[in-house]
Amino acid sequence: MAARTLGRGVGRLLGSLRGLSGQPARPPCGVSAPRRAASGPSGSAPAVAAAAAQPGSYPALSAQAAREPAAFWGPLARDTLVWDTPYHTVWDCDFSTGKIGWFLGGQLNVSVNCLDQHVRKSPESVALIWERDEPGTEVRITYRELLETTCRLANTLKRHGVHRGDRVAIYMPVSPLAVAAMLACARIGAVHTVIFAGFSAESLAGRINDAKCKVVITFNQGLRGGRVVELKKIVDEAVKHCPTVQHVLVAHRTDNKVHMGDLDVPLEQEMAKEDPVCAPESMGSEDMLFMLYTSGSTGMPKGIVHTQAGYLLYAALTHKLVFDHQPGDIFGCVADIGWITGHSYVVYGPLCNGATSVLFESTPVYPNAGRYWETVERLKINQFYGAPTAVRLLLKYGDAWVKKYDRSSLRTLGSVGEPINCEAWEWLHRVVGDSRCTLVDTWWQTETGGICIAPRPSEEGAEILPAMAMRPFFGIVPVLMDEKGSVVEGSNVSGALCISQAWPGMARTIYGDHQRFVDAYFKAYPGYYFTGDGAYRTEGGYYQITGRMDDVINISGHRLGTAEIEDAIADHPAVPESAVIGYPHDIKGEAAFAFIVVKDSAGDSDVVVQELKSMVATKIAKYAVPDEILVVKRLPKTRSGKVMRRLLRKIITSEAQELGDTTTLEDPSIIAEILSVYQKCKDKQAAAK
């Protein structure tokens, strides 16, 4: 009975979400406003209890999702997804061991949910609009065409020895063929790992080897911002060090010829030989769907594992409810498919919902700073989802590039990847959205699978505050923790952001190292999932994300462990020690700052600095190159030899007068020493301007 009642409640909520594109009144940043709607699970704010008494309301459904997960998620999974075999158990989870299981006993195929079900109903509906690098050259792909391409590619993979459970690396820019490659893997039960087509050969090889990939799929070249990217050359260098790779399937984005070696297979030629029909493999709910590598605070990037049913359900529901997506809408997420945002909100969420999804191959400023908005006008995009880094960049070009184009099709604007500052939020809302579009600042992670905290879903007319994620999605139960591991109660408080209950979209493990998964996410606060982020909870129960609490920095929305940069720097023979920290950056949100110690025998330190920048770009990616590299005689260390990065961060953020506890510092005089070097560097930069 509870499940049926809940299902009707969700239905009422889905109906009430229609028409939320009008922006409610907003206070300016930093100014509180009258609270008209509570948020979060029961207990997060006093207003929740009263609001939860209204059946079918956001607070009521949110409280029910927290109180009765099986009754909430069970009917949604049954009605949203196409099943081969029904599940017998909705959930079986234990945070103490990192055990996460949803919809156990059920079997389905993700590609059937994303393609076949829509082809049966409306085969000529547009699935993808490929916004290619050159504006005005977009290509539309119907669901029928995408299914046929997927099946041909799936059959090609099978012919080249890929079986259920095998891993396939996809090193491709945003394109219909890249989407088909993901879905082809899903169709035959293979596991894909999409690797951002900007990573170096060394980073690519590390991920291929960790995943033990049997096949790599790539293009001869890529096009981005008017430049040619030599993808095949990077793959050639990488696979020299990848013993598990048996074939490299090479498609062509340009007409330019590339070297084809013994491993290489011309993909289009092989696909043309294959049948456009491929029987889908029936997969268990908890079988691996994909792994995606994300940076940790230490060591090699982690292969985050997502599985079939729970991930797909969560991606589809968050896409529909957070963005108010309606049938016939054009959904424009401009993220790369090499990141989780591209997985969930370019591919799996929109396609499961039968949406038309835009694939954006270019950059925000090619050929000019109006590119996003010209694309919105030409494609008539209804929901636009992008990163604060791009917003901050475009803001500096002024309003004229925005106002030049018709943006009346837009109803929802979304921000993702990092906290958005007030200035960027206000500009996006006022200038881009004409003060009428709903702006959703979304918080989530690779590990969460989908959006966890956002202004929507909510009650109709509920307030939205600038630069604030605000309300937990259904089933997300946020908790703030203090340094002692105790729950922080009440309002206007800060703490480590944890989640106290499992949800379907969350990651299941780190590939090949479940203990690392447990240690990274469940050890710091036993019984809770630790996000690694800090948060602030307001009087109304809303959440504002305050940033990372570990040694992970967020550069233009790309998470990167400082240890990765330090490891790359350590390979230089003239640099015995380094410390990398993140610091605020006007455009990127955060940037990397490296302090290095150079050997006396090294010679010209300026040459060393340039060599280090080249090494980091080669070993990781260009975006990982530190904006500043400062040569110092020594690093501040504790008596036990630990580098005190906190003090270095204070120095470069002009907080050197408030260093806090330095009693464990081996030699306090080092602070003045580094400050002097840093000030000389700043003076030199100022003089150069």
From Swiss-Prot:
GO molecular function: acetate-CoA ligase activity; AMP binding; ATP binding; propionate-CoA ligase activity
Biased composition annotated in UniProt, kind: Low complexity: 32-46
Regulation of its function: Inhibited by acetylation at Lys-642 and activated by deacetylation mediated by the deacetylase SIRT3.
Chain segments carrying region Disordered: 17-46
Coiled coil (residue ranges): none
Annotated positions binding ATP: 417-419, 441-446, 533, 548, 559
InterPro entries named among the record's database cross-references: Ac_CoA_lig, ACAS_N, AMP-bd_C, AMP-bd_C_sf, AMP-binding_CS, AMP-dep_synth/lig_dom, ANL_N_sf
Similarity comment text for this entry: Belongs to the ATP-dependent AMP-binding enzyme family.
Name of the protein described by the UniProt record: Acetyl-coenzyme A synthetase 2-like, mitochondrial
Organism, scientific name: Homo sapiens (Human)
